[in-house]
């Protein structure tokens, strides 16, 4: 179970100041992060340490992360919002 303090901390780290990232990351943190396994939670935290411009390119699908694990997390987040 995820503690509320951890969720609060991640909520603020997910607010990037770039609207395109905020609309993806903030709801993901609130709605999906608590359901992730420990490995994916750690991966999400690692994703948050990346530069905004890098993440913007990944989420807009202009580029891909060189790290396949980070790219997998990007895909998890995008799959949540993209129509199937």
Swiss-Prot record:
Primary location class: cytoplasm
Biological processes, Gene Ontology terms: succinate metabolic process
Alphabetized Pfam families for the sequence: Sdh5 (PF03937)
Sorted UniProt keywords: Chaperone, Cytoplasm
Subcellular location: Cytoplasm
GO CC entries: cytoplasm
Its biological purpose: An FAD assembly protein, which accelerates covalent attachment of the cofactor into other proteins. Plays an essential role in the assembly of succinate dehydrogenase (SDH, respiratory complex II), an enzyme complex that is a component of both the tricarboxylic acid cycle and the electron transport chain, and which couples the oxidation of succinate to fumarate with the reduction of ubiquinone (coenzyme Q) to ubiquinol. Required for flavinylation (covalent attachment of FAD) of the flavoprotein subunit SdhA of SDH and other flavinylated proteins as well.
Family: Belongs to the SdhE FAD assembly factor family.
Family matches, as PANTHER family: FAD ASSEMBLY FACTOR SDHE (PTHR39585:SF1)
Descriptive protein name: FAD assembly factor SdhE
Organism whose genome encodes this protein: Pseudomonas putida (strain ATCC 47054 / DSM 6125 / CFBP 8728 / NCIMB 11950 / KT2440)
Source species taxonomy: Bacteria, Pseudomonadati, Pseudomonadota, Gammaproteobacteria, Pseudomonadales
